[in-house]
Amino acid sequence: KQLFINHTNAMKKILTSLLACCVFAIVCSAQSLPSVSILGDSYSTFEGYVQPDTNALWYFNKVRTQTDVTSVQQTWWHLFVKNQGYRLCVNNSFSGSTICNTGYRNEDYSERSFIARMDHLGNPDVIFIFGATNDAWAGAPIGEYQYENWKKADLYQFRPAMAYMLNYLVNRYPNVELYFLLNSELKESINESVKTICAYYKVDCIQLHDIDKKGGHPSILG
């Protein structure tokens, strides 16, 4: 009887060790996946998945008339992460945010702009920057192309702020893949500016088109 008990205890220890090894392997496998961070606006938000959680959102779990998206699994970035074998590092997206510090109604957006949040993206392997939409919609000052010696006042204009942001990101994340996602149906001055500045910093610019939208934002199909 004592031998049977000892044998049973030994088997339990072996099974426990095997289970622990399996869990450890799963965790390590998940952690070894390349990671993605997002610096974005409303197009990249979703309730419960944005850092910090005080950022304004557009997409929620509940049903809303403004959009048919009700699940994080329907968002562009979640589909990418899941289907391409990545894991999410940080999604620092803020609904209504501009790249520069000038927002809607000429308000000061220096606490929510892309350049205010670009230092809070974790340690990813890939960064997607999905912006310029609100700069276009808000009619932010376009400014001149400027690639150095930025002053505070310069960052309230789109072109200087865009260059300032990419200059920071390529130096802050030298071994990270950077991609700028350019929305469809924006002003040509914004499109031209984004492409020109991305080319200057050798950041890939992905021009989007034919996005199905509802309320000006990507739908499930979009």
Task: Kindly label every feature range from the protein language model.
Residues 11-14:
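Positively charged n-region of N-terminal signal peptides that target proteins for export
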Residues 108-221:
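Alpha-helical cap/lid subdomain in secreted, periplasmic
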Residues 35-37, 49-147:
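Conserved SGNH/GDSL esterase-like catalytic core that processes O-acyl groups on lipids
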Residues 43-44:
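Short active-site segment of divalent metal-dependent hydrolases/proteases
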Residues 28-30:
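Boundary at the C-terminal end of the N-terminal hydrophobic targeting segment
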Residues 39-40, 181:
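Short hydrophobic segments within beta-strands
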Residues 17-25:
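Bacterial N-terminal signal peptides
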